[in-house]
Amino acid sequence: MMDNLQKYKPTDKMIDLISDNYSLLQVMSRFGLSLGFGDKTVKEVCEMNGVDCRTFLVVVNFMAEGFSRMDGETDELSIPALVDYLRQAHIYFLDFCLPAIRRKLLEAIDCSENDVSFLILKFFDEYMREVRKHMEYEEKTVFKYVDALLQNNAPKNYQI
């Protein structure tokens, strides 16, 4: 079913996927796929790296097209692969992306002249704290619960 609905397919060359959409390099990185795959297909690259191809393609197609063409594609996802992807995304946002945005804000505003600059930084820092809090909750609670579900060992009194 995926072949008919999605933009990217297992038989596509990985290089074509990247050439078409450079932002998918981040998705590759979060799945542990590195460059140097030559002329191999998406399926071949995933198999070489022990990555669930269907899950990789669902994420890639979601990033490229959003929810618009995802009907029925989530039934065969690898939940462990998806959780690992989300963990890597958290690391990227918390350790790289958000600090880089803050540095750019500091470069762009003059903190010595007015209170507006200070308020912008304060607002961004509060936003970063909320994002960190949310992602830490997912790491410590949600992902732990998902792992327990996968092992048929879910706590009976837990709700997300």
Listing of model-derived features with the role each one plays in the protein:
Residues M1-I160:
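Small-residue-biased structural context
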